């Protein structure tokens, strides 16, 4: 799969077209998504919450198979993003690894232990936000979100 065609191969827009966001935000989201994939995160979803939330542009939602998997995934995302000069603004819920929220400003990562994600149904709570279903590809490009 070429990076130029990554969008067509990796995501499916299930609501209206994704609103336009700054390239830095799209790159940030792409880097977080790639880190989730590299950590074997499952059931990746991106919500474009800019018009319904106002404080962030994207929610990235990912699941792990255990609380330790969630913690490891979050560690990798934080370490990767910090190395790229984008440390998180805040982290909540890391201790138990059931629902960890990592705030990067324009992008917020919600990492869930699988059964807990079903209970909170964050996708249902933000149903008005355009949704991008990610097919968990081997690689993402910065264009993963932009070309939608």
Which residues does each PLM region occupy?
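Long, contiguous binding/interaction regions
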Residues: 1-46, 50-51, 68, 72, ...
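Glycine/charge-rich, flexible interdomain linkers and switch-proximal surface loops
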Residues: 44-55, 89-106
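Short hydrophobic/aromatic beta-strand micro-patches
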Residues: 61-63
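Compact, glycine-rich, soluble single-domain proteins
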Residues: 69-75, 79-86, 101
